[in-house]
């Protein structure tokens, strides 16, 4: 990637003019058009204003028949001069009044944000050009609005494509209460009608005549039993930068925001630049803060950086950080297939060799051993053979893509099938383990028997009481994994690195906190939930919130 920042020779791949990977970015306000751009694509003509000739408003003299004695010529000349002078004075006074009036009169909508929407055009394969509202030369036509990908700004600087902006329209509590007793189908119909009214009114206020929502999904794409995309349909392919995961397959993928690049950069002058990340680029294994510093050095300290979500929202980096510290860096890394694992030594998959009768009427403690270690060093052991045959699947746990949590094979296979398949092939386990499961009652009993805390000890993950005092003294925070619980206090069957609890400012489960001799709120006590953001599209006829609002999380 080539930011070409001052004092920085590294490159950031941008889809903007002047960068190594260019999208032929066109500033619509600063370039003349001839109807076709350099790529041969038709330009949106936004400069079609014409001069209107001024017309003099002088009236012709009124002719009246002379029925009386002829007036004295001097008197007539005097009266004519007086009338002409008086008319000119009145006209001058009116013109001055109008000049003063229009010189001071603001245009309708002058108090709206000048960057409340961005229009994006596709100028080639993996190439895009964006223009903010204030940089448009001429108001686009209805067809031109609908041919673009329209991005709407919310109250904290995130930008939403049409279907997601429509989805975020709030239903007033009073209306929701009225609809509560209706059949679900009728509820949905009434809610849609209300949102559509708000949508159309908001577009009229913004001056946008193209109002298509583009919410229709591709009817040729079948969903799984949970109404989610099947693994083979969860990705779109770019020409140069690999695959990108998406959450929905829209009929109009461009207008719905699915094809947009990874990063949107908005300068203080409201110029728009786009950028992709890819494996081995100039920011490989570098943190987002370094990228941010280079971009702001190049474009200005008030430059905004938006990172695309899998749903298609361009999230402001400061907004992401206000919710989860380090989340902007994690997303920045994911674009290039990197992760931000706190402990890169965790085994990719383990099998629990504990929970066996101890010969004294009890059970041995949990002891999760690296599957790779077993297969490499004990290839002929009964445990190794059983694992190869797909047995012991309910004792196996696998590492998630982020490298910071373990989960069951079936859970990972469902949530991240691509990573699951790669991991199982890597360690030599059959993917059929991901299609096994117990009845819920059995599954939750097993979760409840799990150790509250396990720690990394070479190729093992062991319970705290099994560690010697010396090892406990050497224990690092990044070696500790916590058995997670949901909001109801139930075990989820997953383990998460305690450093993630700290990063996310999460409350520790009480049993884990007791073992670690830490208060449950050690990490969560300082957490302050950010103010909810004003949606990108809202009903101007009512107050969004009755309570006073403080500053937004990023003052945008």
UniProtKB/Swiss-Prot annotation:
Family matches, as InterPro entries: VirE2
Key words, A-Z: Crown gall tumor, DNA-binding, Host nucleus, Plasmid, Secreted, Virulence
The UniProt record lists the keyword DNA-binding: yes
Compartments, record wording: Secreted; Host nucleus
Keyword Secreted recorded: yes
GO biological process: DNA-mediated transformation
Induction statement: Targeted to degradation by the host proteasome by VBF and Agrobacterium virF in SCF(VBF) and SCF(COI1) E3 ubiquitin ligase complexes after mediating T-DNA translocation to the nucleus.
Skewed-composition ranges (Polar residues): 10-25, 36-51
Ranges of biased composition (kind: Basic and acidic residues): 52-73, 539-548
Domain of life from the UniProt record: Bacteria
Principal subcellular localisation of the protein: secreted
GO cellular component: extracellular region; host cell nucleus
Region (Disordered): 1-95, 527-556
Entry GO MF terms: DNA binding; identical protein binding
Pfam families, alphabetized: VirE2 (PF07229)
NCBIfam families tied to this protein: PRK13868.1 (NF010442)
Role description: Involved in DNA transformation; mediates the nuclear uptake of single-stranded DNA copies of the transferred DNA (T-DNA) element. Binds single-stranded but not double-stranded DNA regardless of nucleotide sequence composition.
Protein name: Single-strand DNA-binding protein
Lineage: Bacteria, Pseudomonadati, Pseudomonadota, Alphaproteobacteria, Hyphomicrobiales
